[in-house]
């Protein structure tokens, strides 16, 4: 009797079972433009050319980094997929694009159908929050490649914007105003440092300033800003945007500025959430290091003309969204200055 693929560590039947388990969640993400269902060699999406007569496709790909280690150690697999979606769709939103569809890549050492379905369920939830369709993906069983119970996840998002509506920051000028939207925590960045300071023995501990266990605060999924920001983009009053990921406010905002411009941010403009101050205190992390590593409670930034600030604030408040006027664009020096 010769060897079988299953004996080598790859269970095709388990893969098929995982597909059946994930189908209901995937089905909830379908948009009218989607053609066909799961199981094809490629995902099909018919772009609405009435809505996008001059389409520019915007794409983004990302993973969730070492935040995965928390999911493994906490045995929490239902939200990490939302992180993967958020990291991709928030990036393409910066260019003014509406996310249209998403594909995922999940690699495992041993395929456990129920766990795979949990992960993909989180991806589907993220797609629902972003309004995009999950039109395909790949689940790869790779025996001997990952430790027991571990996996890796990555995503790929495609969106569209009409060419005249593309947002590239080129219209930003000195005196324009920064408006920040709150994050839900560390999002998916800085977890190598987070895990160095917040060791697993602390995750079940209740810190009064957090109002929950540390573990719950750490595993909370990345916010998806699409449905909050798209209406603002449609108002044509947004000059530039930044998704605050690795590098924090310090590194990410300058990426969208024309040459010769910088940013002045008032540190008193918002209260840094307790999760960040707790990490800074326990790890004795310097302020500058915090600001160039973490989002510090601000997950997304809009830049608008001064005369449009009230309009943007009113729109956000009507949508139940908090926002903070962080500072302004400066013509005096490049980079970010904290006041």
From Swiss-Prot:
It is found in: Cytoplasm. It holds the Pfam family AIRS. GO terms for molecular function: ATP binding; phosphoribosylamine-glycine ligase activity; phosphoribosylformylglycinamidine cyclo-ligase activity. Keywords: ATP-binding, Cytoplasm, Ligase, Nucleotide-binding, Purine biosynthesis. It catalyses: 2-formamido-N(1)-(5-O-phospho-beta-D-ribosyl)acetamidine + ATP = 5-amino-1-(5-phospho-beta-D-ribosyl)imidazole + ADP + phosphate + H(+). CDD domains: PurM. One of its GO terms (biological process) is adenine biosynthetic process. Coiled coil: none annotated. Gene3D superfamilies: PurM-like C-terminal domain, PurM-like, N-terminal domain. Its EC number is 6.3.3.1. Pathway: Purine metabolism; IMP biosynthesis via de novo pathway; 5-amino-1-(5-phospho-D-ribosyl)imidazole from N(2)-formyl-N(1)-(5-phospho-D-ribosyl)glycinamide: step 2/2. This is Phosphoribosylformylglycinamidine cyclo-ligase.
